[in-house]
């Protein structure tokens, strides 16, 4: 009986610590989701503003090229649809999100379109990406249980953005900016989706459907 009474304070302290860790984890998830939502909105606005500077025929042509082309970050293996996203573990979604954010650290500094607002946005984006990367890394550490086992493909090196965009052709400057902004918007949407699903799973909500 005495041993039971001795164990009770230990169990209570353990329970409080566990609850505190869960609350801190949710707080970090809330911050991360809010940050990536803001980045996604900024990406959408920058893309729309840039499209507004193009002639209708030019816009249609670039859109056709982009649909047939690919983003540099497509080298990162990620879920191909909603069903696969929901089947993925929280840890896998966090690692993919981390890689996607990391892949934009350099190209975010090259969004120097001839528009002062966009240049200011590109500086803000670089800072926000860095903060989000740190936050996701903390979430990975907080969610990790034992040794993570992922395919080697999940950690393959990305080709450098500079080399990729050097091969865009004669009108590469306009096309390069279009593809950078379109790919950035697409990737921020991906990260927003993955972090939202991961946050929902960690909150133990009954329904985490997209």
From Swiss-Prot:
PROSITE patterns: SOMATOTROPIN_1 (PS00266), SOMATOTROPIN_2 (PS00338). InterPro entries: 4_helix_cytokine-like_core, Somatotropin, Somatotropin/Prolactin, Somatotropin_CS. Gene3D superfamilies: 1.20.1250.10. Zn(2+) binds at residues 38, 192. GO terms for biological process: animal organ development; calcium ion homeostasis; growth hormone receptor signaling pathway; hyperosmotic salinity response; magnesium ion homeostasis; positive regulation of growth; positive regulation of phagocytosis; positive regulation of receptor signaling pathway via JAK-STAT. It is found in: Secreted. The keyword Transcription does not apply. Disulfide bonds join 71-183, 200-208. Growth hormone plays an important role in growth control and is involved in the regulation of several anabolic processes. Implicated as an osmoregulatory substance important for seawater adaptation. This is Somatotropin.
């Amino acid at each position: 009986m005495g041993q039971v009474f001795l164990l009770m304070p230990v169990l209570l302290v353990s329970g409080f610590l566990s609850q505190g860790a869960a609350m801190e984890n949710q707080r970090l998830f809330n911050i991360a989701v809010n940050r990536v939502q803001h980045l996604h909105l900024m990406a959408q606005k920058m893309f729309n503003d840039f499209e507004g500077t193009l002639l209708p025929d030019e816009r249609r042509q670039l859109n056709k090229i982009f649909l047939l082309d690919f983003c540099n970050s497509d080298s990162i293996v990620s879920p191909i649809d909603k069903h696969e996203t929901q089947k993925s573990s929280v840890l896998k979604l966090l690692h993919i999100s981390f890689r996607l954010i990391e892949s934009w650290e350099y190209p975010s500094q090259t969004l120097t379109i001839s528009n002062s607002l966009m240049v200011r946005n590109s500086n803000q984006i670089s800072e926000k990406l860095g903060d989000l990367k740190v936050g996701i890394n903390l979430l990975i550490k907080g969610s990790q249980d034992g040794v993570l086992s992922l395919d080697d493909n999940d950690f393959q090196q990305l080709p450098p953005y500079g080399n990729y965009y050097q091969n865009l052709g004669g009108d590469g400057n306009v096309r390069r900016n279009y593809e950078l902004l379109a790919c950035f918007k697409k990737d921020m949407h991906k990260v927003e989706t993955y972090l939202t699903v991961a946050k929902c799973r960690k909150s133990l909500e009954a329904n985490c459907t997209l």
